[in-house]
Each structure stands twice: as structure tokens, then as C-alpha cells.
């Protein structure tokens, strides 16, 4: 069952028609900045993949992908993508991208096992991007520089929206604050991972939390990550404080991708060394794919944030429990 946060005295500043205009305004402006800041080319991407390819994102390892049988191929199963994290790296090679060049695409996914709430939906829409880097640039400096480029696009978008709409005030700080998961755990040793994220994000306004997926000194990871795309020592989430809901809102997840050594180590830690036999993972181990950095940026979350909406269902179409839909409507939250 979804947990619904009802902000006190909430009222959307935009009706349904004007909300659609606002969504397009946010997406068009931010996308143009992202392309320019990261040197990206838009490409077509798959909605589904062959599960035998190892190309789908296993996320935290327990989410079930949506699959279906293809009649023409004797009901051979295909899986709807959960993200394009692995496919993008493969595409950079196949499409002939050079050092410093990257791609981006609109990624639509179905997360059937998602626990829904104000910011989570079973429908996921994001800009998925990936860029070729040199092996010597697989370091925290490259990660931080890229985070700053993405954050710069976010800030400029907020400034633009504040000009377009009188009710929107700028709340993002000038600079984003960087911290590792271990530093965060040391700062708040008695709190849960989500509580730590909330405290640091509310204090700083915008935070980049780095090194996600590996176990901390207390034996627990800050958050889950699949072992075969991000290098757990070189990845990050961008979170901003969202006063409408009084939460830390994750807008983007990114990372420098695994090389041969990182992949072997992380598959061992995750207890899934059998994945090394899949085609995509074999290509990494055989050093056939380029070194890359990439990530995903939530389209609906960005629209929700910049339009100051209380629920992600105000900016995307999905299916919600009927009682949640009724309660939301009773409090001025119009779900699409």
C-alpha cells in the first residue's frame, strides 16, 4: 500500500492543462542544457531486451522484470527494460562513439515490484545517458566534474522556471555538497541510511552522495546497486531538499562504469559470479567495451520538483490504488 504524504494547505498552482505546458517547458529546457554540458547525441533505445544477453538492469537484485512471450519465436521470452545502464555502454561501441562523446535517450520502464508513494511509481521515465572516457579518467575527480555539470543544468532550469512562473522561488544552493557514504555514516552513526540522507540534504540543500553499493564499516550498504554496471567506489546520487514534502528527493543516479577488475570484485561480493558468463559481462571482462560514465535523471521527478507538485502522479500517468486516488483528490492533488 502506498504511503501518501499530504502537505498542509497544499494547492497546485497549475491546473491540468497548464501542468502539461509546465512539464514540456521543464523537459525541453533541461534536456537542451544536459546535451550541451555533457556533449550528448540523442539515440533510439530498446523498450525490451533478450534476458539471455545480460543487458537488463537487475537493480537491487530482487525486483522482477516484466516479461512476455513472442508468438513468432515460439513464445521466446523478452524482458521490458528496468533501466538502460548496460545497453548504453554496448551502444557506445556499436554506434562508433569517440572519446568525450556520449549518447542520451528517453527511457521508459515498468517497475512492477516498486513500493509506491509520493515520489515512487511503477512507471519510470528518465533521461538515460552514457559517455566515453579514458581509462586514466576513472577517478573521483571525473565523477565530481560530471556531477557539477548535471547540477549546473538543474540550477539553470530552476532559474528559468522562476522567471516563467511567479509562484516558483529558487531554492537550490549555488554549489552541490559532496560526501561519501562512509563519511555520512560516521556523521550520523545512530540513524538509518534514509534518515542520514534526509538530515544531510536538509542541511545542505543539494548533496552528492558517493560510493554506493559496497558495505560500510558497520557491515551494511547505504543503498543497493547492481554489481555489473557502476563501480561502487566511483558512483553517486544527486539529492535535493524538497520543502513541499519535507524530504530528500533523489533526482539522479550516475557512476563511472566497472572495468574488468571492479566487475570481478563486485560479482564476488554480490554472490553472483555466474553473471560473468553472460555476453555483456563477458565483453567487459574481455575489455571489448569502452570505459564510460553514465547515469539516469528522473524526468517525472524533475518536473515534480520544478513545478512544486506534491505527488509524482501529478506529472505522469500511472495506476494508483483507488483509495489513494480518492484521498489525494480530497486534498487537492490531481493524479493523472
Residue ranges and their predicted role:
Residues 101-103, 124-128, 204-206, 246-248:
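Extracellular structured ligand-interaction cores
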Residues 50-61, 170-179, 321:
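N-terminal pre-domains immediately preceding structured catalytic cores
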Residues 105-193:
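Extended, charged alpha-beta segments that form solvent-exposed binding/catalytic grooves
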Residues 34-41, 150-161, 310:
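A generic secondary-structure signal for well-formed alpha-helical elements
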Residues 68-71, 93-99, 119-121, 169, ...:
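A general structural signal for short secondary-structure junctions and capping/turn motifs
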Residues 2-120, 128-132:
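Class II aminoacyl-tRNA synthetase-like tRNA-binding/catalytic domains
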Residues 21-25, 29, 138-145, 149, ...:
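Generic recognition of stable, solvent-exposed alpha-helical segments in well-folded globular domains
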Residues 110, 180-336:
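A translation/RNA-centric and nucleic-acid-associated enzymatic feature enriched
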Amino acid at each position: 500500500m502506498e504511503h501518501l504524504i499530504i502537505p498542509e494547505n497544499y494547492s497546485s498552482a497549475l491546473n491540468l492543462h497548464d501542468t502539461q505546458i509546465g512539464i514540456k517547458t521543464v523537459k525541453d529546457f533541461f534536456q537542451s542544457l544536459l546535451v550541451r554540458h555533457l556533449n550528448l547525441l540523442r539515440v533510439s533505445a530498446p523498450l525490451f531486451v533478450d534476458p539471455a544477453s545480460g543487458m537488463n538492469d537487475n537493480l537491487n537484485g530482487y525486483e522482477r522484470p516484466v516479461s512476455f512471450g513472442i508468438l513468432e519465436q515460439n513464445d521466446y521470452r523478452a524482458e521490458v527494460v528496468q533501466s538502460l545502464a548496460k545497453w548504453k555502454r554496448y551502444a557506445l561501441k556499436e554506434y562508433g562513439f569517440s572519446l568525450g562523446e556520449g549518447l542520451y535517450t528517453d527511457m521508459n520502464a515498468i517497475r512492477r515490484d516498486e513500493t509506491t508513494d509520493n515520489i515512487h511509481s511503477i512507471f519510470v521515465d528518465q533521461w538515460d545517458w552514457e559517455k566515453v572516457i579514458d581509462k586514466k579518467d576513472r577517478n573521483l575527480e571525473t565523477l565530481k566534474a560530471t556531477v557539477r555539470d548535471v547540477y549546473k543544468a538543474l540550477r539553470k532550469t530552476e532559474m528559468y522556471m522562476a522567471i516563467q512562473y511567479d509562484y516558483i522561488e529558487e531554492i537550490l544552493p549555488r554549489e552541490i555538497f559532496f560526501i561519501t557514504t562512509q563519511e555520512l555514516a560516521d556523521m550520523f552513526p545512530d540513524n538509518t541510511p534514509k534518515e542520514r540522507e534526509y538530515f544531510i540534504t536538509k542541511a545542505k540543500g543539494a548533496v552528492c552522495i558517493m560510493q554506493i553499493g559496497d558495505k560500510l564499516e558497520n557491515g551494511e550498504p547505504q543503498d543497493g546497486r547492481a554489481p555489473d554496471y557502476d563501480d561502487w567506489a566511483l558512483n553517486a546520487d544527486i539529492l535535493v531538499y524538497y520543502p513541499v514534502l519535507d524530504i530528500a528527493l533523489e533526482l539522479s543516479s550516475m557512476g563511472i562504469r566497472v572495468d574488468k577488475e571492479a566487475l570481478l570484485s563486485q560479482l564476488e561480493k554480490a554472490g553472483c559470479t555466474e553473471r560473468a558468463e553472460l555476453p555483456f559481462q563477458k565483453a567487459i571482462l574481455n575489455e571489448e567495451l569502452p570505459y564510460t560514465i553514465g547515469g539516469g535523471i528522473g524526468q517525472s521527478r524533475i518536473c515534480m520538483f520544478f513545478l512544486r507538485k506534491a505527488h509524482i502522479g501529478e506529472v505522469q500517468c500511472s495506476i494508483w490504488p483507488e483509495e489513494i486516488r480518492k484521498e489525494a483528490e480530497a486534498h487537492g492533488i490531481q493524479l493523472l
